[in-house]
Design a protein with these regions (language model features):
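The substrate-binding groove and active-site-proximal loops of carbohydrate-active enzymes
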Residues: 1, 35-48, 98-116, 171-183, ...
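Active-site-adjacent "subsite" loops/lids of carbohydrate-active enzymes
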Residues: 1-2, 65-126, 161-169
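Catalytic domains of carbohydrate-active enzymes, especially glycoside hydrolases
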Residues: 3-30, 124-130, 229-237, 302-311
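Aromatic-lined substrate-binding rim segments of carbohydrate-active enzymes
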Residues: 6-13, 26-77, 86, 170-201, ...
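Aromatic- and acidic-residue-enriched segments that line the glycan-binding/catalytic groove
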Residues: 34-43, 74-98, 135-166
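Aromatic-lined carbohydrate-recognition surfaces of secreted/lumenal glycan-active proteins
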Residues: 65-75, 132-140, 169-221, 269-282, ...
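Substrate-binding cleft/loops of secretory-pathway carbohydrate-active enzymes
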Residues: 141, 200-245, 288-289
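Substrate-binding cleft of secreted/luminal carbohydrate-active enzymes
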Residues: 230-252, 256, 262-341
């Protein structure tokens, strides 16, 4: 363990980067449902008490800012807590979506309280510079159809019937905005719990899918709004991952340029946005493939040429030098001369 940590510390130091998003949770099954974490807490099993140690070592020895990367809704907590339900057109019974993150409903007060406890426990056991809210804070245009959500919609003046909401274009648009704000408000509530323990200096960042940035009207499918993110968080972490979005390899460059152009159209957006590239090509069958270091370096160069100031990648396999540091570090620092080191 110590040797692995030393390898990570040296790699981060050699890269001369400013920030690391450090995962505070474990997902050994790869299904997106968080059953274990890397810090002591009151609700979930602790896989190992290492988050605090690794965060401290990275901050003190590598000089980077650490953002604790935490889920918002995809926690495997008490089975009596309300889960997000979806109600497809023509169906009468709401159910948990079989192909989406299994998420807790943000409209259940008990959910908010228990997730808040996890954030408080993290803040009480580790020092860090910010929080990164995971990409699981989303609701499709068929969600949330759980009982607490329906009650919240009614209290906000919406129809009880999601089908009728969907058939009314104006109400459908307002409903999407309501859900977007509800998710954002929940994350701000969580950040307030962290700041109450660690201090007001804690920064916030949140993952957003690329489509709500490229096509703002797709807020209806995600309950994510780029303009809201820019106002609400210190940083918006855009998942600039073409293959994950089904973009063909030959079209990936143009897709990234389209994304950067959209960012440039919004004042101050590029100063508050971080583009997260993919270092792995995820497959539904689990046979994930590493993206070549040359390709990743090319994408980084492309982002720079299109005016992007802040970017990173995920995942980093530091034990196997993937991606290769001598190929990607020139895209982070001009002080890198590998043949002279």
């Amino acid at each position: 363990m110590d040797r692995n940590i030393d390898v990570l510390i040296q790699r981060v130091k050699d890269m001369q980067i400013s920030t690391v998003y450090l995962q505070a949770f474990a997902d050994p099954d790869g299904d997106g449902l968080v059953k274990e974490v890397w810090f002591p807490n009151r609700l979930l099993p602790m896989k190992a008490d290492i988050f605090s140690r690794v965060a401290w070592q990275l901050r003190t020895r590598s000089g980077v800012n650490i953002y604790a990367w935490m889920p918002v809704l995809s926690w495997d907590l008490d089975p009596t807590l309300t889960r997000v339900k979806y109600l497809p057109t023509g169906e009468k019974k709401a159910q948990i979506h079989p192909e989406q993150y299994h998420r807790l409903s943000p409209f259940d007060d008990r959910v908010r309280a228990q997730v808040g406890m996890l954030y408080e426990d993290l803040a009480g056991h580790a020092a860090f510079d910010g929080i990164l809210f995971h990409d699981d804070a989303l609701l499709s245009d068929y969600e949330d159809a759980s009982a607490p959500a329906i009650t919240a919609y009614q209290q906000a003046g919406f129809n009880r019937s999601l089908s009728e909401i969907r058939q009314n274009p104006e109400q459908f648009k307002q409903w999407a905005r309501f859900k977007s704000r509800a998710l954002t408000d929940f994350t701000l509530e969580l950040s307030a719990r962290v700041k109450a323990i660690r201090g007001p200096h804690i920064k916030t960042a949140r993952n957003i899918f690329a489509l709500p940035v490229i096509q703002p009207e797709s807020e209806a499918w995600f309950a994510q709004n780029y303009a809201d993110f820019l106002k609400s968080y210190d940083w918006t972490a855009i998942m600039a991952m073409p293959y994950m979005e089904g973009v063909a390899e030959k079209s990936a460059d143009q897709w990234l340029i389209q994304l950067t152009n959209q960012i440039k159209n919004i004042p101050q957006a590029k100063d508050k946005s971080i583009l997260e590239l993919q270092a792995q090509n995820w497959q539904k069958n689990g046979q994930h493939q590493a993206i070549s270091s040359q390709q990743l370096a090319h994408w980084m160069s492309l982002l720079q040429l299109n005016g992007v100031k802040n970017y990173g990648y995920y995942p980093d396999n530091f034990l196997h030098n993937q991606p290769e540091i001598d190929l990607i570090r020139p895209e982070y620092s001009t002080a890198w001369y590998p043949k002279n080191d």
